[in-house]
Amino acid sequence: MTIIVASLFLPYTPQFEADVTNSDTAKLVESSMIKVDCNNQELSNNKQERSSSVTSASSHYIGLPQEAQINGEPLQRANVGSPATGVNYHNEMEMLSSEQFLEELTANATHAANSGIPPANNPVSSGSTAQRPSVEEFFSAPSARVCSPSQEASASSISASRSSAHHNDLSSSLMKNPNLSFDSHPPRVRSSSKSAVITPVSKSVPDVDPAVVDVAKVREEFQQQASLPSMKRVSGSTAGDSSIASSSSNLRYSQQFQDNFIEDTDSEDDIDSDLETDATKKYNVPKFGGYSNNAKLRASLMRNSYELFKHLPWTIVDSDKGNGSLKNAVNIAVAEKTVKEPVSWVGTMGIPTDELPHEVCHKISKKLEQDFSSFPVVTDDITFKGAYKNYAKQILWPTLHYQIPDNPNSKAFEDHSWDYYQKVNQKFSDRIVSVYKPGDTIWIHDYHLMLVPQMVREKLPKAKIGFFLHVSFPSSEVFRCLANRERILEGIIGANFVGFQTKEYKRHFLQTCNRLLAADVSNDEVKYHCNIVSVMYAPIGIDYYHLTSQLRNGSVLEWRQLIKERWRNKKLIVCRDQFDRIRGLQKKMLAYERFLIENPEYIEKVVLIQICIGKSSDPEYERQIMVVVDRINSLSSNISISQPVVFLHQDLDFAQYLALNCEADVFLVDALREGMNLTCHEFIVSSFEKNAPLLLSEFTGSSSVLKEGAILINPWDINHVAQSIKRSLEMSPEEKRRRWKKLFKSVIEHDSDNWITKCFEYINNAWESNQETSTVFNLAPEKFCADYKASKKHLFIFKISEPPTSRMLSLLSELSSNNIVYVLSSFTKNTFESLYNGVLNIGLIAENGAYVRVNGSWYNIVEELDWMKEVAKIFDEKVERLPGSYYKIADSMIRFHTENADDQDRVPTVIGEAITHINTLFDDRDIHAYVHKDIVFVQQTGLALAAAEFLMKFYNSGVSPTDNSRISLSRTSSSMSVGNNKKHFQNQVDFVCVSGSTSPIIEPLFKLVKQEVEKNNLKFGYTILYGSSRSTYAKEHINGVNELFTILHDLTAA
């Protein structure tokens, strides 16, 4: 048996390497048909080291070549390639225009102004000498002369790089060379100085209006244009020609973006992926032709591209994309034998595949399958980007985080991107089905693959399937804004088990299924179309032991010393967030500003270090934040000595990040909405010495796990956050220690190992429960008659919803003459008696178990009726909103009918709202609303089961019930157990038959009979289902009620 883990990206990816001195390669680079990554061993090592963090986020760095910075030499265009050919090799951001440079320069002006703090962007120098510049300057005091533990730099070089002259010349030097070419994507592994890691370039999604254009046809045309190879975007100026540059601009934010999307750092790192470039941006095509328009040349380049990737050496390396927390948890569980079964992965390779020859793709796939147990899902680039970048990132992700897309064109955009999303999900489903073997467990992850569970279920109805959503799940009011909401929900509940990070997300999902699908839900189950889906929550965590070993690393210890020197006698508030609106960056800065204004004595004593990772696609939001940052820093009397805010729009090396956590006096998370923020867990483990307080937004999933020790804050309450900052800085050591112990205990209890164990336990239990309810055999009439004759005391309970026919009345009369026979229905007592008044000895169970007639007398099973007036008021409102609908009030239940409603399209919405309202309002009173055969029933729960237990107790004990009372029964004890008295055993019921079509009313009776047989309290038990059902506790099946009465006729005639 194998565990099949399906995630968007595989944990491994192919890496190609090319000789940069080759002339054919040079032509392809100039044509922008491939992407070249320059060598940077240090950053690749950093990615490997960050395996224990939530994501393995790499960064974009923009700055100066280190030699030019240190020696003060004139800046020249950075050339990578053969000196003989003089070819320039460019990365994704091939050129920086003056406009873009001013944007980057201004973005880093906040900390560049400090003589001890360089710009937060990293240069990539020419050739193989690329290094991350001046990182130690950021962490070191101006007077310090300590080398970075992660770089081999001479003392003189470091000293020179810290000189004030260098910083004075920095801006002027860059201003003189605004079109400098910078590389931004270092490779994972260092190659020789004459080689480079290259990646094929993906096509962009067609920008069409689906209302007037056949999207499928346009996409097909895009894919078939072999003479028009995919091109890299050019930013600012044309590639390869320094004489052509875009005009300068004094405006820092001049570029406008139509669509803003929010990055998902909790789930994946998509910074270094060509597949994930913004599909809404247009190519910057040079005027008057610019690039060659020669079709033969393009075709030749395309052939060269295929030939290049056909012969290039490649290897499989660890991927830095995807859900880092998932990969870490699975790998650790496998290594520690928590998971004993072999694990296979299903996902995409993480690189564009359209430019790769088919045979190369096939070889890579075989290598991944055979050596890495990874099964690639290969789809064309346009479909992948349409599904991931357009639908998942710009529709699903914002909506799941309460940021509903409100662009006027979003509806059309959503419609055509939904088509891509379905296609990618179908690809995943097909791949999983091809890999699956009986007995395997399928575990599907996150919002990219919400349709996969149901797609797999259609092909593999008996498979064991789990689904886990790593991000938040919103309330039904928000989720219902999605156009394809029902399809998504039905896709998710194709799984046996659905998991969430918190109890709140689980509750939202249950309410949404109840409201939008009119599904019957309980505290931890969804019942829909005869399927029962387990819904639980299990917060993910980190591996404490692995992180602790990294904290003892020599580099971390040295960085800690540098940080202490750099900010001696300062209080450090550390923050690390993805750069997007839901992280609450602006509100955080406003709260910090309020704190400093109200407590000016802290201006020279506190430094807030804000680390932002990920791309910024929202210039206006960045401008708003930087305005506040500049305002805060202006509070300082001397910004070169005391800078209240250090704003870094880049990630740090993992060793630096851990060191900063260790030295932090406060860790602040002010997100407006977020899933499980594992940076909090990393901080808690890192702060084992200082026991620093954690300020945590109550709107994060982490707050449900860490609420005992964290200081919970409302990011919308600026004043409260400001007060909480002061409280945390002034907290006594005793309170710090007490709070930290609680936080640390939560981290240990909710670690990655516990998460894996819980999830598989839930998946297995849910599957086993479904197996019990899905094994139904056709009733064998001969055995049924034989067991009937072999027993002495018989109890029959028939659930009959329709008025009886004369044949049914005749057979029931004959059967009840020698047996105990009861009919169960939703009819009222008066209606029931009028229908069955011709059958003298028959017993009746009215209103689904609320009342039982024994020997001509009625007995109450129902206990509570005072809720009915409140429910009637709710239905009054629904009847007004839905003309033609009506409701009926019985003695113990209310039924809401919509079959005559004028607007049938609104019926599901109104029913869903009514059910959600009632079940939420009466959740603690055992009053439940459910839909059966398009009628909404509202009644006390468990009445039919209580009635059955009442009858078994009565007929087994021989005790006459007291009028208008209920025989007391314990639900945990057997309702049929009567002790060891042999004589008394002879008088108890030894044959029970319960029959009817599946419904929430009769299923508990099926389960009861099954349990009594298993406990040997009942000799013969038959649970007979008629009609169709895929999930039931019944063990025998017949075609319909007519077949049932035919068998009863044979039984009585025998």
Swiss-Prot record:
<feature type="modified residue" description="Phosphoserine">
    <location>
        <position position="960"/>
    </location>
</feature>
<feature type="modified residue" description="Phosphoserine">
    <location>
        <position position="181"/>
    </location>
</feature>
<keyword id="KW-0963">Cytoplasm</keyword>
<dbReference type="InterPro" id="IPR003337">
    <property type="entry name" value="Trehalose_PPase"/>
</dbReference>
<feature type="modified residue" description="Phosphothreonine">
    <location>
        <position position="265"/>
    </location>
</feature>
<feature type="modified residue" description="Phosphoserine">
    <location>
        <position position="267"/>
    </location>
</feature>
<dbReference type="GO" id="GO:0005737">
    <property type="term" value="C:cytoplasm"/>
</dbReference>
<dbReference type="GO" id="GO:0003824">
    <property type="term" value="F:catalytic activity"/>
</dbReference>
<protein>
    <recommendedName>
        <fullName>Trehalose synthase complex regulatory subunit TPS3</fullName>
    </recommendedName>
</protein>
<dbReference type="GO" id="GO:0005992">
    <property type="term" value="P:trehalose biosynthetic process"/>
</dbReference>
<dbReference type="GO" id="GO:0005946">
    <property type="term" value="C:alpha,alpha-trehalose-phosphate synthase complex (UDP-forming)"/>
</dbReference>
<dbReference type="InterPro" id="IPR036412">
    <property type="entry name" value="HAD-like_sf"/>
</dbReference>
<feature type="region of interest" description="Disordered">
    <location>
        <begin position="112"/>
        <end position="133"/>
    </location>
</feature>
<feature type="compositionally biased region" description="Polar residues">
    <location>
        <begin position="122"/>
        <end position="132"/>
    </location>
</feature>
<feature type="region of interest" description="Glycosyltransferase">
    <location>
        <begin position="287"/>
        <end position="778"/>
    </location>
</feature>
<dbReference type="Pfam" id="PF00982">
    <property type="entry name" value="Glyco_transf_20"/>
</dbReference>
<comment type="function">
    <text>Regulatory subunit of the trehalose synthase complex that catalyzes the production of trehalose from glucose-6-phosphate and UDP-glucose in a two step process. May stabilize the trehalose synthase complex.</text>
</comment>
<keyword id="KW-0597">Phosphoprotein</keyword>
<feature type="modified residue" description="Phosphoserine">
    <location>
        <position position="148"/>
    </location>
</feature>
<feature type="compositionally biased region" description="Polar residues">
    <location>
        <begin position="170"/>
        <end position="182"/>
    </location>
</feature>
<dbReference type="GO" id="GO:0042802">
    <property type="term" value="F:identical protein binding"/>
</dbReference>
<feature type="modified residue" description="Phosphoserine">
    <location>
        <position position="273"/>
    </location>
</feature>
<feature type="modified residue" description="Phosphoserine">
    <location>
        <position position="150"/>
    </location>
</feature>
<comment type="subunit">
    <text>The trehalose synthase complex is composed of the two catalytic subunits TPS1 and TPS2 and at least one of the two regulatory subunits TPS3 or TSL1.</text>
</comment>
<feature type="region of interest" description="Disordered">
    <location>
        <begin position="223"/>
        <end position="250"/>
    </location>
</feature>
<dbReference type="InterPro" id="IPR001830">
    <property type="entry name" value="Glyco_trans_20"/>
</dbReference>
<feature type="region of interest" description="Disordered">
    <location>
        <begin position="155"/>
        <end position="203"/>
    </location>
</feature>
<dbReference type="Pfam" id="PF02358">
    <property type="entry name" value="Trehalose_PPase"/>
</dbReference>
<comment type="similarity">
    <text>In the N-terminal section; belongs to the glycosyltransferase 20 family.</text>
</comment>
<feature type="compositionally biased region" description="Low complexity">
    <location>
        <begin position="235"/>
        <end position="249"/>
    </location>
</feature>
<dbReference type="GO" id="GO:0030234">
    <property type="term" value="F:enzyme regulator activity"/>
</dbReference>
